[in-house]
Amino acid sequence: ELQHDSEYRRRAVFALESLAEPMLRFPTAFGHLLGCADMELHGAIEVALVGRRGSSKFRALETAVATHYVPSLVLAGGPPGESQMVKLLDDRPLIDDQPTAYVCRGYACDRPVTDADTLSEQLENAAKAGAVATA
């Protein structure tokens, strides 16, 4: 999901489909792959954190994400304008020149936020609602 690359997605789905029978027979041996299968079926909740990593406000946003259990979470962070390697960070500007968080599902994002409390609310709502399929 970080790159939104259809070729990577095709390969991942092929790997999951190829191992479907063994995953059914021996689920405890495939914990990570079962998590990937869940993400493929139900979609991901994506969080983009944009800002200077060392700042206290950026760390507060990181802490808000880290303190919530969100199944199928995809997280990316970094400074604005340096998103060539991570498509999730594309077109995600700072709001009022402050570190900004974007919570997205199925290529649609909640309103961008700059404070940890509002980000926590968005993450709680996202975890309750679950993700939507992106395929």
Please provide the spans of the model-predicted regions.
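Aromatic (Trp/Tyr) and acidic
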Residues: E1-A135
